[in-house]
């Protein structure tokens, strides 16, 4: 792997980054020397670095990310592993095509850590957070041609905005928020994270604001980010394809931060673990379906107290794992 010099010079700012549920990832992924591993959400490369270190550098890793800035930073971090690490600018749902491109036929482990990274949240110009004012963007890949959150907020109908906030944010105030957004943009376009947060907060009754532990805009920002980046669709595509690409004994580890995502993973693993689907009154199986995975996590694995004290953002992380039969 060739490191990007512009980011390698600042590499020290990323080495302190500790990825979420790191010990749990290594436990369930159980990487071994000579294995081939996919990190579909490379981010700053923390999980990948730990996987390679666990194998003494004697493994092969494919890292994907659609955030060019994060990809460049991870490339610098993983440069010591040389050509044993391959990185690509891509969505994790594209993993199979990239495996074909580089000649990989099977995986011994696959990891995706879904959601926005600390680097993205902490960079105001990316527009993911309302804690620091910035342009209303929220795209994982700002250089791409997908519409930003600003476009969605300033052009979406009340019905469309309500659907997004209700579905992806599960916010009971979705209708009020959608109407408040449309009313506010009629006066002036909503172009910054601070203004959107103010508009959303104004839609909440005072009694709701008083009893809520989180900022009223939290769910709306989450919903818009998921809609802008097609996050649920991305996950569905990945889950439909990953089992076919796993070697026997290969493990799939998925970290989610949203109940909808966790539900998709839970159901996908459950369905792949099922055998015969024939009605009970049929004495001999005619469907031919056989279990393809063993589910390793009966319930989602969450962060321990020590990690929560060190990183409050880990509080909503849930890990599920399955092993290819």
UniProtKB/Swiss-Prot annotation:
Keywords: Cytoplasm, Methyltransferase, rRNA processing, S-adenosyl-L-methionine, Transferase
Gene3D superfamilies per UniProt: Putative methyltransferase TM0872, insert domain, Vaccinia Virus protein VP39
Cellular component GO terms, alphabetical: cytoplasm
InterPro entries, sorted: RsmH (IPR002903), SAM-dep_MeTrfase_MraW_recog (IPR023397), SAM-dependent_MTases_sf (IPR029063)
Pfam families: Methyltransf_5 (PF01795)
Superkingdom of the organism of origin: Bacteria
Record EC number: 2.1.1.199
Catalytic function, reaction form: cytidine(1402) in 16S rRNA + S-adenosyl-L-methionine = N(4)-methylcytidine(1402) in 16S rRNA + S-adenosyl-L-homocysteine + H(+)
GO biological process, one term: rRNA base methylation
GO MF terms held by the record: rRNA (cytosine-N4-)-methyltransferase activity
Cellular localization per UniProt: Cytoplasm
Role description: Specifically methylates the N4 position of cytidine in position 1402 (C1402) of 16S rRNA.
PANTHER family assigned to the protein according to its UniProt record, in alphabetical order: 12S RRNA N4-METHYLCYTIDINE METHYLTRANSFERASE, S-ADENOSYL-METHYLTRANSFERASE MRAW
Protein family: Belongs to the methyltransferase superfamily. RsmH family.
NCBIfam families: 16S rRNA (cytosine(1402)-N(4))-methyltransferase RsmH (TIGR00006)
Listed name of the protein: Ribosomal RNA small subunit methyltransferase H
Protein source organism: Oleidesulfovibrio alaskensis (strain ATCC BAA-1058 / DSM 17464 / G20) (Desulfovibrio alaskensis)
Gene: rsmH
């Amino acid at each position: 792997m060739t490191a990007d010099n512009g980011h390698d010079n600042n590499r020290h700012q990323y080495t302190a980054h500790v990825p979420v549920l790191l010990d749990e990832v290594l436990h369930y992924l159980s990487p071994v020397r000579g294995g081939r591993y996919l990190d579909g959400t490379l981010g700053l490369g923390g999980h990948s670095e730990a996987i390679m270190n666990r194998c003494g550098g004697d493994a092969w890793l494919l890292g994907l990310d659609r955030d060019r800035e994060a990809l460049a930073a991870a490339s610098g971090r993983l440069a010591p592993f040389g050509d044993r690490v391959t990185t690509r600018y891509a969505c994790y749902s594209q993993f199979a095509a990239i495996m074909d491109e580089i000649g990989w036929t099977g995986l011994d482990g696959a990891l995706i850590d879904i959601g926005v990274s600390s680097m993205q949240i902490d960079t105001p110009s990316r527009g993911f957070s309302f804690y620091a004012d910035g342009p209303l963007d929220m795209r994982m890949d700002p250089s791409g041609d997908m519409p930003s959150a600003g476009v969605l907020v300033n052009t979406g109908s009340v019905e469309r905005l309500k659907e997004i906030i209700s579905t992806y944010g599960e916010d009971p105030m979705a209708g009020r928020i959608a109407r408040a957004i449309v009313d506010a943009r009629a006066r002036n376009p909503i172009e910054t994270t601070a203004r959107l947060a103010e508009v959303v907060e104004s839609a909440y009754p005072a009694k709701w604001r008083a009893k809520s532990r989180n900022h009223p805009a939290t769910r709306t920002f989450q919903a818009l980010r998921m809609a802008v980046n097609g996050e649920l669709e991305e996950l569905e595509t990945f889950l439909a394809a990953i089992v076919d690409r796993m070697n026997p004994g290969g493990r799939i580890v998925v970290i989610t931060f949203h109940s909808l995502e966790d539900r998709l993973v839970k159901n996908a693993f459950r369905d792949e673990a099922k055998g015969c689907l024939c009605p009970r009154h049929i004495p001999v199986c005619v469907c031919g379906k056989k279990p393809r995975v063993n589910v390793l996590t009966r319930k989602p694995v969450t962060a321990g107290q020590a990690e929560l004290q060190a990183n409050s953002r880990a509080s909503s992380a849930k890990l599920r794992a399955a092993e290819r039969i």
